[in-house]
Amino acid sequence: MNGFGRLEHFSGAIYEGHFKDNMFHGLGTYTFPNGAKYTGNFNENRVEGEGQYTDIQGLEWCGNFHFTAAPGLRLKLHM
């Protein structure tokens, strides 16, 4: 698949965004089965670059993601 699309996994996970060669690639949103969500850049099925992670409590974390690491994340406060 290439271009924009939506993939729903039987686990409840959902990816909506850009695909390249059947992989998450470019901007997209991945919603985890527990309701947490990552919105940002993907590179060959991996989170890569600027993005935002919203945890199950609704807290929003912004920063630079690199596969399983996210050094220097910032908590976004709504006042």
From Swiss-Prot:
* SMART domains per record: MORN
Keywords from UniProt, A to Z, are: Repeat
Q: Which InterPro entries match?
A: MORN (IPR003409), MORN_repeat_protein (IPR052849)
Q: Does the keyword Manganese apply?
A: no
> Has the keyword Repeat been applied to this entry?
yes
Repeat (MORN) residue spans along the chain: 15-37, 38-60
PANTHER family attached to this UniProt entry: MORN REPEAT-CONTAINING PROTEIN 2 (PTHR46917:SF1)
Name of the molecule in the record: MORN repeat-containing protein 2
Instruction: Name its species.
Output: Bos taurus
